C-alpha cells in the first residue's frame, strides 16, 4: 500500500532496522528474507534521499536522518496497532494478554503481589513480565516496549500520562546492636555512618540518593546492592545503617530484628509512587482495565497503612522493633 508515494510496508522495515541494528535480525523480526530486507533499505534510501544506515562491522549505524525519523515511525506503527489492529472488546476472563512492567523490588513485594493475586482470579490467562529499572524510561515508553512504569513520581517522563498510587516515606534501619546510631539522628550522623544502599540501573540514583544530591550531601556507601530486599543481611551484626521505605521496613521487622529510626525530615520528605503508561495506550481497553486494578489495589495499600501510621503517631517511630 502506498501513501503519497511511500510504500507503508517500508516503515515497518525501518522500525525493525532501528530496533535490531543488524540486517539479519531485523529481517527475521518481520519475517522477511535478508535479500528482501536489503531491497527495502535501498527503497528507503531512494524515498528519503539519505543513506539512512552505514555498516560498522556487522552493525547498522543510523544516520541523523534515520534517528530523526525513528520516533515518529514507531509512534505511528504503535498507534495503528492499538487503535486499528488490536482494537477488540477486552474480556479479562478470556484474555491472554501479557503486560511488561518496570518496577522496584519494594513495589513488587508491597504492592504488585496484591495485583497478581487479583488478576489470577479475574483473568487467569493474563501474564506479567516484570523488568528491572532502566536508565532510559522515556525511550521505553516512546517505543512502546513496556506497558507500565511503576516508579517514584520524580523519576517519571514529562511526556506521558501517569496516575498516583500512594505516598511513602523513608526511615533509617539498622541492627538492634548498632552502637553508633544515636536515638535522634541528625543529618551529620546520617552522612558520616557506613551505609548499605540499593542501586537501580547504572546511571539512575535511588530516591534517597537523589534527595541527598538536591541538598549537596553525600553519604558513605560501604555495601551497594541491586535492590531494597537485599539490604537487611548486610546490616546484621554491624554498625551500618540503611534507608528503606517505611512499609518495607515494617514488613521486614516482622521477621528479623531491626531498629527503625526517623530520618531528618527536611532532607527526606514523603514521596509519591505512581504508575505511567505510553500515551498511545491511554484508550487501550486492556491498559484501562489494568490501570483500574492498580488504582483500586493502591487504595487498599493506603487504607491498610493508615492504621499503622496512626498507631505510630504519624511521624514517631519506636527506636527498635
UniProtKB/Swiss-Prot annotation:
Protein name (database record): Nodulation protein D 1
Transmembrane spans: none
Domain HTH lysR-type: 6-63
Keywords in alphabetical order: Activator, DNA-binding, Nodulation, Plasmid, Repressor, Transcription, Transcription regulation
Function: NodD regulates the expression of the nodABCFE genes which encode other nodulation proteins. NodD is also a negative regulator of its own expression. Binds flavonoids as inducers.
A GO MF label: DNA-binding transcription factor activity
DNA-binding residue intervals: 23-42
Family (UniProt): Belongs to the LysR transcriptional regulatory family.
Naturally occurring in which organism (per UniProt): Bradyrhizobium japonicum
Database matches in Gene3D superfamilies: Periplasmic binding protein-like II (3.40.190.10), Winged helix-like DNA-binding domain superfamily/Winged helix DNA-binding domain (1.10.10.10)
Alphabetized InterPro entries for the sequence: LysR-type_TF, LysR_subst-bd, NodD_PBP2, Tscrpt_reg_HTH_LysR, WH-like_DNA-bd_sf, WH_DNA-bd_sf
Top-level taxonomic group: Bacteria
Amino acid at each position: 500500500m502506498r501513501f503519497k508515494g511511500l510504500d507503508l510496508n517500508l516503515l515497518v522495515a525501518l522500525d525493525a532496522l532501528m530496533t535490531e541494528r543488524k540486517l539479519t535480525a531485523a529481517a527475521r523480526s518481520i519475517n522477511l528474507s535478508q535479500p528482501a530486507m536489503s531491497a527495502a533499505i535501498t527503497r528507503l534510501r531512494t524515498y528519503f534521499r539519505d543513506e539512512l544506515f552505514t555498516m560498522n562491522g556487522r552493525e547498522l549505524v543510523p544516520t541523523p536522518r534515520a534517528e530523526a525519523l525513528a520516533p515518529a515511525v514507531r509512534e505511528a506503527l504503535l498507534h495503528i496497532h492499538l487503535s486499528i489492529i488490536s482494537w477488540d472488546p477486552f474480556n479479562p476472563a478470556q484474555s491472554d494478554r501479557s503486560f511488561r512492567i518496570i518496577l522496584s523490588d519494594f513495589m513488587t513485594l508491597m504492592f504488585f503481589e496484591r495485583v497478581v493475586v487479583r488478576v489470577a482470579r479475574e483473568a487467569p490467562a493474563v501474564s506479567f513480565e516484570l523488568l528491572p529499572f532502566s536508565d532510559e524510561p522515556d525511550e521505553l515508553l516512546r517505543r512502546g516496549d513496556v506497558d507500565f512504569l511503576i516508579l517514584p513520581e520524580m523519576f517519571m517522563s514529562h511526556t506521558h500520562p501517569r496516575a498516583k498510587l500512594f505516598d511513602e516515606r523513608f526511615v533509617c534501619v539498622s541492627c538492634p546492636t548498632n552502637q553508633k546510631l544515636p536515638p535522634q539522628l541528625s543529618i551529620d550522623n546520617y552522612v558520616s555512618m557506613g551505609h548499605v544502599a540499593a542501586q537501580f540501573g547504572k546511571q539512575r540514583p535511588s530516591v534517597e540518593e537523589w534527595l541527598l544530591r538536591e541538598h549537596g550531601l553525600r553519604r558513605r556507601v560501604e555495601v551497594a546492592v541491586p535492590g531494597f530486599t537485599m539490604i537487611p543481611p548486610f546490616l546484621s551484626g554491624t554498625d551500618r545503617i540503611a534507608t528503606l521505605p517505611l512499609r518495607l521496613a515494617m514488613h521486614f521487622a516482622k521477621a528479623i530484628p531491626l531498629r527503625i529510626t526517623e530520618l531528618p525530615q527536611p532532607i527526606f520528605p514523603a514521596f509519591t509512587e505512581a504508575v505511567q503508561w505510553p500515551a498511545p495506550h491511554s484508550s487501550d481497553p486492556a491498559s484501562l482495565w489494568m490501570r483500574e486494578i492498580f488504582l483500586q489495589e493502591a487504595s487498599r495499600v493506603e487504607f491498610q497503612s493508615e492504621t499503622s501510621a496512626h498507631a505510630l503517631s504519624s511521624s514517631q517511630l519506636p527506636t527498635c522493633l
